[in-house]
Amino acid sequence: MVVFSKTAALVLGLSSAVSAAPAPTRKGFTINQIARPANKTRTINLPGMYARSLAKFGGTVPQSVKEAASKGSAVTTPQNNDEEYLTPVTVGKSTLHLDFDTGSADLWVFSDELPSSEQTGHDLYTPSSSATKLSGYTWDISYGDGSSASGDVYRDTVTVGGVTTNKQAVEAASKISSEFVQNTANDGLLGLAFSSINTVQPKAQTTFFDTVKSQLDSPLFAVQLKHDAPGVYDFGYIDDSKYTGSITYTDADSSQGYWGFSTDGYSIGDGSSSSSGFSAIADTGTTLILLDDEIVSAYYEQVSGASGETEAGGYVFSCSTNPPDFTVVIGDYKAVVPGKYINYAPISTGSSTCFGGIQSNSGLGLSILGDVFLKSQYVVFNSEGPKLGFAAQA
């Protein structure tokens, strides 16, 4: 475990603007998420979202969650301050709004190869105007809630913030399920996990980050997601104004293609810390925190009126409840998730019952620390090592 001071972060994170070497020019840049309300009222199938997160990592989706997802038992309309936050990316000649996902390694997008009925409301990638097709290459992704997407693969120019590559594999959707079509705010996904889990066949392709990291000041990116506000991604440098104290580093386990790491314990509310650590993945593409049953049960024992209601597909409680904080111990650092973040959303529009931001990992064997966790932290994803760094947001 290494603690990294702000002074060191400033020295190592200098951008090309202050570099004395004229060539080759390297860069560091920041790109902001933006709010993307859909053209029509957006709904979220909460158990469907939960099922998709479990299946993404090869987990078993409980039958009760499958049934709740298929029945739409917990479909909610977010309030205005719960809009979807996405990131603008130029792909070929199109500007698309993508979900940045540290838990996957594909860059796939809505394209004009989709049937016209599935294009409505989305910004589209038009490969014929700029791309070279990778003949014989395809991709196909499916999730635990029944959603799926597939299509052909192209080589094209992709620009994120201040960095451009003309050698990026872009996966253009030609088939896509209704779950994706209905979310007209989102035009696709940009994976930031390790390239080893890219799904393109017959040969996996590199992620955008792996393609461009040699252009960056440092081969890293840092994430500052926010609660009820757009977040920020810093590529190539660490912004010391975005965190307090010091950054605590721990080794990242990339053996499964994810940003995995080991924690050193946890605590609930004002309770003492448990020394029982657990293996986890830092995933911007998962909304919830998914933990071992023992930890989940211990947490909801401290939430008045909470129940593992099978009809809703997960733990629920009264929306008026103030759940306790949840703390993850990483070395000497304690990453605190405020309880209000765990009061995630009403199980249906206007309901007084809320779906919990902490749910079971269904025996997955590792925990997923998704956005509910990440929105309290400034997290550094460094490919050298690799390693992960954590600090409280400023």
UniProtKB/Swiss-Prot annotation:
Intracellular or extracellular location(s): Secreted
Protein's job: Secreted aspartic endopeptidase that allows assimilation of proteinaceous substrates. The scissile peptide bond is attacked by a nucleophilic water molecule activated by two aspartic residues in the active site. Shows a broad primary substrate specificity. Favors hydrophobic residues at the P1 and P1' positions, but also accepts a lysine residue in the P1 position, leading to the activation of trypsinogen and chymotrypsinogen A.
UniProt record similarity statement: Belongs to the peptidase A1 family.
Catalytic reactions on record: Hydrolysis of proteins with broad specificity. Generally favors hydrophobic residues in P1 and P1', but also accepts Lys in P1, which leads to activation of trypsinogen. Does not clot milk
Maturation-removed propeptide residues: 21-69
Gene Ontology biological process: proteolysis
Active site, UniProt feature: 101, 283
EC number(s) per entry: 3.4.23.18
UniProt xrefs under PANTHER family: ASPERGILLOPEPSIN-1-RELATED, BETA-SITE APP-CLEAVING ENZYME, ISOFORM A-RELATED
Cellular component GO terms held in the UniProt record: extracellular region
Protein name: Aspergillopepsin-1
